[in-house]
Amino acid sequence: MEIKQYQIILVNLDPTIGSEIKKTRPCVVISPDEMNDHLRTVVIAPITTSSKNYPTRVEIKHDNKIGWIVLDQIRTIDKHRILKDLGKLSKPEIKEVKAILKETFVD
């Protein structure tokens, strides 16, 4: 499967430790295509359907459900954890993800 930045993928996140988000769930690919094409790992942010209004979370609508991209739990996973493709973020969602990533990790 070809993996692209801002793609939504179904990922098995188990096993986890402590407060890490667990289970098999949708995640957003954060790593750029150049990395995704050449490495056996990808950087992802999990999506949850239960969230508080944290400044590091982006609300999205996917598969007729409201969810939040959890940018405060970004992690690197092996591609073998990816189960299937679920779609892609919209352009406004991508713009908001970029803004929060920049504000959180760059500024």
Where are these regions (language model features)?
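Conserved functional hotspots at enzyme active or ligand-binding sites that engage polyanionic ligands
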Residues: 1-107
